[in-house]
Amino acid sequence: MAQEPSFFVLAYYHFTAIADPHQEVKAHKEFFKDRNITSRIYLSEQGINGQMSGKREDAEAYMKWLHANPLFETMPFKIHSHHENVFPRQTVKYRKQLVALDEDVDMNQTGQHISPLEWKELLEKEKRPLLLDVRNEYEWQVGRFDGAECPPCDTFREFKEYAENLKTQVNPEQTPIMMYCTGGIRCELYSSLLKKEGFKEVYQLEGGIINYGLKQGSEHWLGKLFVFDDRLTIPISQEPAPVIGSCHHCQTSNETYYNCANMDCNHLYLCCQTCVEKFLGCCCTDCQNAPRVRPYHHQDVHKPFRKRHHYFKDDLTSKQ
């Protein structure tokens, strides 16, 4: 019997000038004290980028608390229900960059936000803009908008090179682009990067895939959504989601992610149950023979984003 969804999972971001982000980190930690909340929240002089989960009453209190702060009073939240917390711990940190791009971008020159309804209408046009998925390759393998251009990038930093190559393949002044990501924040930066490369007409999906699923359902979407927490994949709406991913080893239809058991690889990949047992949780035979391999137990599927000392308590070097 399915457990009742008594928790909220929140996704949110907001670009705003924060004079003392370290103080905001302290304020968050003080507010979270004695509350049933787990999180991955980053603050900088640029603003906030957050994901958190907690009991409904705690999540609602947090949203009310943030909206009472003039810095965040207009910030929208994207909300999913769940039956438990989805992060391994409570993390609130200062970060110099809200998104790792290593490129100066002009936040006054970003793409035009379009609502999920406007996005759907654009997708249904006979001649629509170039549809661009700006997530990592391992993310779009399990789900994407139908007909999207999906760059084979493993990190967000690689998109700069992709943008430079794209403008040699199409006319940037005559090629409109509609881009999307999970929750919207990567599009803020990447749309600015595209404009810097000379693209004149750039649209970005407001609130990302999460918001589209909440407002428009699964129309024009294929598969599931990769998320950066212990759920790993979720349907974007209540509608059934077809499996479009395939096993890294045998190519059979699959949507289950694993981190390679070789701690020096830790590659995130899709794998079926047969192959994960055959390769003992590793992405290749070389990794099986590596010196730092997590123990594989078929009844104890490894959750993502765990450090070595989670498995080897005496491994002090990994805690450095």
From Swiss-Prot:
Its EC number is 1.14.-.-. Keywords: Oxidoreductase, tRNA processing. It is an enzyme of class 1 (oxidoreductase). Gene3D superfamilies: 3.30.70.100, Rhodanese-like domain. It catalyses: uridine(34) in tRNA + AH2 + O2 = 5-hydroxyuridine(34) in tRNA + A + H2O. The active site is at C181. The keyword Oxidoreductase applies. The keyword Transcription does not apply. PROSITE patterns: RHODANESE_3. Residues 125-221 form the Rhodanese domain. One of its GO terms (molecular function) is oxidoreductase activity, acting on paired donors, with incorporation or reduction of molecular oxygen. InterPro entries: Rhodanese-like_dom (IPR001763), Rhodanese-like_dom_sf (IPR036873), Rhodanese_C (IPR022111), TrhO (IPR020936), TRHO_N (IPR040503). SUPFAM superfamilies: Rhodanese/Cell cycle control phosphatase (SSF52821). GO terms for biological process: tRNA modification. CDD domains: RHOD_YceA (cd01518). Catalyzes oxygen-dependent 5-hydroxyuridine (ho5U) modification at position 34 in tRNAs. PANTHER family: RHODANESE-LIKE DOMAIN-CONTAINING PROTEIN 7-RELATED (PTHR43268:SF3), THIOSULFATE SULFURTRANSFERASE/RHODANESE-LIKE DOMAIN-CONTAINING PROTEIN 2 (PTHR43268). Belongs to the TrhO family. This is tRNA uridine(34) hydroxylase. The lineage of its organism: Bacteria, Pseudomonadati, Chlamydiota, Chlamydiia, Parachlamydiales.
